[in-house]
């Protein structure tokens, strides 16, 4: 009976597909990438560094606000993690994880919006090898690391980590990665230092997608993942990210005199990112949780409703997951040309930067000055990965097949009309985003026993352009070649001062302001295939102010900070299907103004020789301070559907940014044992709002006050509470003394190694096993139409959620010598 119901529903949907036009249901890739779950599981603290000897430090931080909230998408002071910069010797580099920072013995200074890393001399020489197991992401990993003095004033710090396996909690998640990081330094007579670094991490991992409350409730699984399905009885994911973006760094420092030091640095990042997804050509979306395939879509057709509901509740994977077998069967029925295929959005990156400058002593202070040049080229195209049993597709714009006006402008590239695309070929779009920056900077630092003062300024010039490699028929005169150059003059100013008011009492203030361009993709109306820029591109403005009080004694540290962060005049471009006009559209949102302010407190107390208590809290308000303005263009002709219509977002909270975050922990270390417990709370969290859904043209569709409230109310997410445990034991072995010999012409030296040891670690995240914590969520920008009596009613389509992991485990064993 169950199979008959499935066949009945399938036949109905096939008939329905034959009557419906092409549906624009693609998720915007750039937007969705932000919500990809890439949480880093931090290992428990390993040893006595957790309760090391106290030293006065004006930069004191418990780090708890950075590390203890992996269960949710955290935004410290309202700044999302993906907007935080990582700087190595003042040059921006891709994200570097905490374990790598510790292994390479990098100096680290963190703030709410950036992490500054500095290559330092080795603090200790050590080699280690370890194995780790985690119940989430890629469970199995092995690692090797070493920090050595090599002779002839060379030193090396390096680590190698390999990860693999399938996630034990979420179906369809698996991956492999190999990470290698190394820093070599060379010194000459205490006046010159050369630093060379390499960071490389080739990886392949599947990702999960957010889904609707209806899907989670029907499956009874908050970890439901619609991105995978079965093919020939084996699990296959449609969303796989493949990355290899190695970064090389070279730094040189030369003490020219007692007063002046020369600093040169350069970075090069060159590699490729690929992200796969299913394509459909003149067919319906294969996404299993699409609103047209859910029981709620058939509310007025009882038989179909119950049949679909039964398939979902019964976890019929032909319906609840991607039916790859059916996709292959559909392709076979269509002959050699594919109806469904798996493609990859590819981005090739070449990013280089050079920074040159000098530091000169001026009395009790010094001044640093110099220049920085940055060039970036991002080549973007679509590549066919798997034709799912077929032999080719024709490189056409299939969204236009049923278009009465533009149905004769189908060619994606007029240079190769009707080209047959096979596996491995580029198709669809091919373009490059180019950016060139040049800037001059100066920093003055003044220091006495009580006062520290930093004043930094930077002015620059920025040139952004697009180059199209395809001549799209729809925009034959404005898709190929180099676009208009968009030019900006960004600048930044930062003032920081700290003062020792009395013994153990510090006061610090920071003031920063900067202007910078919006994201390159948000400067073009249709970056994939059109050189047209948005109207009047403008820079965004960021302002930050904070005042901090710090009290420190050998057994206690308390830091209290008042902060204000204003991000103003931002622009965002997204691509959606506009349900009111029935057009695939390009949406430009201007005047996005955000304000974040609040209080941040961190404290640490050491007692009874071996105990440490820590606590940190943020109480803030993160909101949109003005309404923004939305312009909607048809994707086919760039004609205006809506021009600068007001979006009523004023007063809404920033999405996925807890405005209350509290964490408290207790740790113990003695005789090689380390144990810690942390309790974490995050509240006043809200869903990511849709600006498009709050325009007057949408709100005018409400037929009652209740429906208007449903369209405008921002959903508050459930508060999150977790408890984490960690335990480790270090078994110290005999002390080793190694002698290292150089060539006969060089002297011999002896390097005293610390005691070798075995370290066993165990960690538990979310000890209580809470399964209803929303990791992140966002509102849909689509409408759904219902017929009630003789009129149609529009409601916003269901919001999408991603839930946090339940109880997870981490265990490792490491031998260090």
Where do the model's predicted regions map?
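Gram-negative outer-membrane beta-barrel transporters
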Residues: 562-566, 587-693, 812-816
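Transmembrane beta-barrel wall of Gram-negative outer-membrane proteins
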Residues: 135-164, 169-208, 240-258
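Acidic/polar loop-and-plug regions of large Gram-negative outer-membrane beta-barrel proteins
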Residues: 185, 193-251, 274-343, 406-421, ...
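C-terminal beta-signal and adjacent terminal beta-strands/loops
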Residues: 7, 22, 613, 681-699, ...
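Outer-membrane beta-barrel signature, preferentially recognizing the C-terminal barrel domain
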Residues: 225-247, 251, 433, 483-492, ...
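Signature of Gram-negative outer-membrane beta-barrel scaffolds
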Residues: 341, 368-502, 518, 522-528, ...
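A beta-strand signature from Gram-negative outer-membrane beta-barrel systems
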Residues: 92-143
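Surface-exposed extracellular loop regions of Gram-negative outer-membrane beta-barrel proteins
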Residues: 211, 411-420, 463-474, 485, ...
